[in-house]
UniProtKB/Swiss-Prot annotation:
Organism phylogeny: Bacteria, Pseudomonadati, Thermodesulfobacteriota, Desulfuromonadia, Geobacterales
Native organism: Geobacter metallireducens (strain ATCC 53774 / DSM 7210 / GS-15)
Record-given protein name: Elongation factor Tu
Pfam families reported for this sequence: GTP_EFTU, GTP_EFTU_D2, GTP_EFTU_D3
G5: annotated span: 174-176
GO cellular component: cytosol
Length: 396
């Protein structure tokens, strides 16, 4: 069969299934493809195809992830599902699979369990902005009051992590019934309801090009008679010739004007998200700007040294540390294009962190870096990656 052409007519949204082990995340993923395949909006993927997820390496970390894609009337979705709990943790922290929203799967028979809680916390920490709940295995609970209690418990749990628990859609159903072709209320009807809720409740993400301009500086050189050029890949937004930008991070923030934009040795009027450009900067000396700083729309990003983060520490097998680390650990933090030394504070009651752990830490950098919440970083020792993290909140 010929490969169908990817139609770019519908808006694209990235989602994923999260939740406790054996609550039915993979079964639900398979059920969604089955129900939508009947409408010609997906290719059916069986449980085993999704469960035997290939391992991928993201920033030196091995993660098993399954990717499926499907469409609804309104949208095109890319959906990630992970076989193991550790894979979820790694995925969410590294941003390997950036989620615009998530489907939290909770078994009606068990209610929220430890990993339910941990995945909600992670979603909050790493900036997964929206959650829709699928209350699975609802056919195993005969007591309507019990179902209502579980639903209430889920709403309270979501609210305790600053999600709008009262407003979040909760759809009851049985992923297994739907996967087996049952057309009743808990079977494929529930899947249709779920996808309607995802369509309606999870908004389209803001595209990189619509965000304020930011370009990490990778290299700097001077062109005699013309001035200083900073090169890098535009991360977001657009910069036009003649616009004012700020140089942020490492040193005191300064303003300059972009007097030229070059790409592949051609002069352009503007540089856009995704472009590798050279920006000619007015009145900037070669020594005023360095790798690790960013060019950004004035006022859109500020430099910081102290922040809270969620981090995953690589195992020995992944090429990480062989031993635990303790409070006051001083590795390098690699942000965008450069390493900065930082001191790690562990949470109260945590004596040490073992390879393979994930942990909430407070970090104090020795030099300021341009950052906002959600920024990803690597933790390195002498150029070797030993962990990955994401900024969850900025302190100063």
């Amino acid at each position: 069969m010929a490969k169908a052409k990817f139609e770019r007519t519908k808006p694209h949204v990235n989602i994923g299934t999260i939740g406790h082990v054996d609550h039915g995340k993979t079964t639900l993923t398979a059920a969604i493809t089955r129900v939508l395949a009947e409408r010609g909006q997906a290719e059916f993927k069986g449980f085993d195809q999704i469960d035997n997820a290939p391992e991928e390496r993201e920033r030196g970390i091995t993660i098993a992830t399954s990717h499926v894609e499907y469409e609804t009337e309104k949208r095109h979705y890319a959906h990630v599902d992970c076989p193991g709990h550790a894979d979820y943790v790694k995925n969410m922290i590294t941003g390997a699979a950036q989620m615009d929203g998530a489907i939290l799967v909770v078994s009606a028979a068990d209610g929220p369990m430890p990993q339910t809680r941990e995945h909600i916390l992670l979603a909050r920490q790493v900036g997964v902005p929206y959650i829709v709940v699928f209350l699975n295995k609802a056919d195993m609970v005969d007591d309507e009051e019990l179902l209502e209690l579980v639903e209430l418990e889920i709403r309270e749990l979501l609210s305790s992590y600053d999600f709008p628990g009262d407003d979040i859609p909760i759809i009851k159903g049985s992923a297994l019934k739907a996967l087996n072709g049952d057309k009743d209320e808990l079977g494929s009807e529930a899947i249709v309801k779920l996808m309607d809720a995802v369509d309606a409740y999870i908004p389209e993400p803001e595209r990189a090009i619509d965000k304020p301009f930011l370009m990490p500086v990778e290299d700097v050189f001077s062109i005699s008679g013309r001035g200083t050029v900073a090169t890098g890949r535009v991360e977001r937004g657009v910069v036009k010739v003649g616009e004012e930008v700020e140089i942020v991070g490492i040193k005191t923030t300064t303003k300059t004007t972009v007097t030229g934009v070059e790409m592949f040795r051609k002069l352009l009027d503007e540089g856009r998200a995704g472009d590798n450009i050279g920006a000619l900067l007015r009145g900037v000396k070669r020594e005023d700007i360095e790798r690790g700083q960013v060019l950004a729309r004035p006022g859109s990003i500020t430099p910081h040294t102290k922040f809270k983060a969620e981090a995953y520490i690589l195992t020995k097998e992944e090429g990480g540390r062989h031993t635990p680390f303790f409070n006051g650990y001083r590795p390098q933090f690699y942000f965008r294009t450069t390493d900065v030394t930082g001191i790690v504070d562990l949470p109260a009651g945590t004596e040490m962190v073992m390879p393979g752990d994930n942990v909430a830490v407070t970090v104090n950098l020795i030099t300021p870096i341009a950052m906002d919440e959600g920024l990803r970083f690597a933790i390195r020792e002498g150029g070797r990656t030993v962990g990955a993290g994401v900024v969850s909140s900025i302190i100063e």
